[in-house]
Amino acid sequence: MFTLAARRLAIRLPRVRFGSSSAYDEALATIRNDLKLNFRFKADVLEKNVIRSILAETKNLEIDNKDKDLDEFKLYDLLSKMIKQRQDSAAIYLKEGSPDRFRQTGWNELREVDYITKYLEALPVASAEEIEAKVEPIVQSVLEEEGELKSPKEIFSRIPWKVVNQDWQASEGAVKNTVLRLYNLYKTDA
């Protein structure tokens, strides 16, 4: 009798992401659909593993941020991080003097980067060139006023962080990476 009552109470409701944007949901639906197609047509095993790792990382992101809104910008940062990890490991595997089996692993890592990049480019966020076009005038204004760049904080303090997501259509991580890259570029020239 108790088990019957417990079964009635344990009704599982479907999980609904109220705090995620439609672009985030569409991107995940595309990734899941690609996984289904990969299973159905027995396509590339490496692609299937990459899609599974993307879904696992997004699940971890959802668990870590269960009380926060998830949007395409957080997914962009996640996919960018995954690409960076694979590029770093590929560089280690492909260095001169590595055994052939390590080199093959490095080439597989670079193939994984291609698959992840496909999903990264499908997100409705600003490209690196568009972000650089918005950060460049800020760097130039700092250079005009200060004469040289002493630290990246001078640039970071002038970025309108509250409107980066809405107006710039960029993630904060992508803007930070662009600022640091431009800072290093102009710092060495000065």
Swiss-Prot record:
Transit peptide: 1-26
GO cellular component, one term: mitochondrion
Main location group: mitochondrion
Entries under Gene3D superfamilies matching the protein: Uncharacterised protein YqeY/AIM41 PF09424, N-terminal domain (1.10.1510.10)
Subcellular location: Mitochondrion
Keyword field: Mitochondrion, Transit peptide
Keyword Transit peptide included in the entry's annotation: yes
A GO molecular-function annotation: carbon-nitrogen ligase activity, with glutamine as amido-N-donor
Xref: Pfam families: YqeY
SUPFAM superfamilies given in the database record: GatB/YqeY motif (SSF89095)
Family indicated by similarity: Belongs to the AIM41 family.
Protein name: Altered inheritance of mitochondria protein 41, mitochondrial
Organism the protein comes from: Komagataella phaffii (strain GS115 / ATCC 20864) (Yeast)
